[in-house]
């Protein structure tokens, strides 16, 4: 095995019986339930912050505890969302290790196909769906702590599409570099944000913001990406997504 992909989950589910994929119980520190999966709550972890950091608690744990030390390529998917590929699984076909090795010969990062907002920018979409002040604060933090990323942030905000879900596969070296930068920004944002008045959905702030920051990191580092369709094992209601997009934009 030269690759390892973590599958973030918060519940018992069906997972590929393939050593490429390893389910990891995110937010395990917040529950007494043990599904028998790898947990994000041992050694150095932020498992207890899962309600705010979402699947990032798995990434932080893997990064800080050198989980990927024996492989060259690393990644993250979700219990119901995988990259499309040629490996049969649960009525779908998902990414195989052979494809990972092949695709990453000519690309730096495997990413989900972009979500296109069509009628609004990345910036206005975030402001309609979440809180503008958090986006403004994140931009300020980047200007203060990582000014070389400021132009990439501004560029992304003006675009009308981006990669979502915090799904990727990349080299271990790129992963370590990304984690170091990402958590520097997010932990500073955490220091400056009072979540006490956020409802459970909006309290997932750092998960939402990291989706934007992932794109900023890709842009700034001029990384060559390969877009891959996302297989949603539970299906996806695109009409409902379109309705909610319009509702947030015009009825907020």
Q: Language-model features: where?
A:
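ER/Golgi luminal nucleotide-sugar-dependent glycosyltransferases, focusing on the catalytic module
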Residues: 1-252
């Amino acid at each position: 095995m030269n690759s390892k992909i973590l599958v973030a989950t918060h519940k018992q589910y069906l997972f590929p019986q393939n050593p490429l994929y390893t389910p990891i119980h995110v937010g395990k520190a917040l529950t007494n339930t043990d599904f028998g999966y790898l947990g994000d709550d041992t050694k150095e972890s932020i498992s207890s912050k899962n309600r705010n950091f979402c699947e990032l608690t798995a990434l932080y744990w893997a990064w800080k505890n050198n989980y990927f030390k024996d492989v060259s390529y690393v990644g993250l998917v979700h219990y119901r969302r995988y990259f499309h590929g040629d490996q049969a699984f649960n009525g779908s076909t998902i990414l195989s290790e052979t494809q990972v090795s092949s695709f990453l010969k000519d690309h730096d990062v495997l990413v989900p196909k972009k979500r296109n907002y069509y009628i609004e920018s990345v910036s206005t979409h975030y402001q309609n769906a979440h809180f503008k002040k958090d986006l403004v604060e994140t931009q300020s933090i980047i200007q203060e702590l990582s000014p070389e990323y400021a132009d990439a942030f501004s560029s992304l905000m003006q675009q009308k599409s981006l990669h979502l879900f915090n799904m990727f596969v990349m080299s271990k070296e790129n992963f370590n570099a990304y984690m170091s930068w990402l958590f520097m920004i997010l932990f500073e944002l955490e220091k400056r944000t009072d979540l006490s008045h956020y409802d459970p959905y909006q309290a997932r702030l750092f998960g939402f913001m990291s989706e934007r920051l992932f794109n900023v990191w890709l842009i700034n580092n001029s990384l060559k990406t390969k877009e891959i369709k996302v297989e949603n094992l539970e299906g996806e209601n695109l009409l409902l997504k379109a309705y909610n997009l319009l509702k947030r934009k015009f009825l907020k």
